[in-house]
Design a protein with these regions (language model features):
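A short helix->loop->beta-strand "cap" motif at the edges of active sites that frequently abuts
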Residues: 71-73, 98-101, 202
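A contiguous active-site-proximal alpha/beta segment in oxidoreductase catalytic domains
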Residues: 82-152
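Beta-loop-alpha module in the N-terminal Rossmann-like domain of NAD(P)-dependent dehydrogenases
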Residues: 18, 37-94
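NAD(P)-dinucleotide binding in Rossmann-like oxidoreductases
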Residues: 185-188, 202-260, 266-270
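C-terminal helix-rich "cap/oligomerization" subdomain common to oxidoreductases
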Residues: 1-3, 8-9, 38-41, 51-56, ...
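N-terminal Rossmann-like dinucleotide-binding module
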Residues: 1-38, 259
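Rossmann-like dinucleotide-binding domain that binds NAD(P)(H)
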Residues: 148-217, 275-278, 282
């Protein structure tokens, strides 16, 4: 595979993680821009590379992504894609019109634990009982909680955390078949959303998504309840002391997938993934 050169914008927690994984795949970062560290003095707009990694604060994503797409440079950007529904869709449309790869790092969609869960759910849904109206009685609950952190305080918890769960939900059910029934923000740190699949093959499915980034718990889980069965899966691994262990495969998988996009593979899948990320923002942004 070709050796790629890249630019990194934002060398914080996620920037460092993305950089390390791309470097392990042979990528060389020719420039790093961060509020605390810059490896080059040249203006950002004068630099060229095979792609850019954007891991700066969420409120800056839209402007950075738009600039690089307009320059024809492929973009790998941390979630959320943007902070408004209109901006998120604009970026997806721009990438499509420019024929430039756009990838949003929503790593839970690449979490092998979730991928196994989704495979099981698809099989169960195919065999699920239906009521007199042909609807499926399946209730999903997504929970994502962790303690307070100074990271990602420029956006509310829905754009910070809920986009993960929304993107997973939207890989199972088509956005155009889904209706947002209720959305509640309890300050900047706690939100929940109630969604219903109102049309299509899986009409009747309901989902409640709860997120909290100022909790005394550390939870990343999905539960699924049918008429006669229940499944619960944790998306995180826990050490013996109860602390969460990061599932490294999630990040590794998404980086490998992005490099395949650069190589020209999986184009249709890549476009659907970018649209999925925009659709998650549309729901999370309210």
């Amino acid at each position: 595979m070709k050796k790629y050169n890249a630019i990194l914008i934002g060398n914080g927690t996620m920037g460092k993680r993305h950089r390390a994984r791309f470097e392990s795949c042979g990528v060389e970062f020719v420039a790093i821009y961060d509020s605390k560290e810059c490896t080059v003095k040249s203006p950002l707009e004068s630099l060229d590379a095979d792609f850019v990694v954007i891991a700066s604060p969420a409120s800056t994503h839209y402007n950075y992504v738009k600039d690089f797409l307009n320059r024809g440079i492929p973009v790998f950007v941390e979630k959320p894609l943007a902070t408004t529904a209109a901006e998120a869709q604009e970026l997806v449309d721009l990438a499509l019109s420019k024929e430039v790869p756009l990838f949003v790092a929503q790593s839970e969609c690449f979490n092998p634990i979730f991928l196994n869960f989704r495979k099981q759910m698809v099989a169960e849904l195919k065999m699920a009982k239906r009521d007199a109206d042909g609807k499926i009685n399946l209730k999903l609950e997504f929970r994502r909680e962790h303690g307070y952190s100074e990271r990602c305080r420029d956006v509310n918890v829905a754009l910070d955390l809920m986009v993960h769960d929304l993107s997973m939900f939207l890989t199972m059910f088509k956005y155009e078949n889904v209706q947002l029934e209720n959305f509640v923000n309890s300050g900047d740190d706690e939100s929940w959303a109630f969604l219903r699949v109102v049309s299509g093959e899986y009409a009747g499915v309901e989902a409640c998504i709860k997120v909290n980034r100022n909790s005394n718990k550390d939870v990343r889980m999905i539960s699924a309840s049918f008429d006669d069965a229940e499944y619960i899966v944790s998306l995180a691994k826990y050490r013996g002391d109860g602390e969460v262990e990061h599932v490294s495969d999630s990040l590794d998988n998404e980086h490998r997938f992005f490099l395949r996009l650069l190589y020209g593979a999986c184009k249709d899948w890549g476009r659907r993934a970018a649209q999925n990320a925009a659709n998650a923002v549309k729901i999370a942004a309210g």
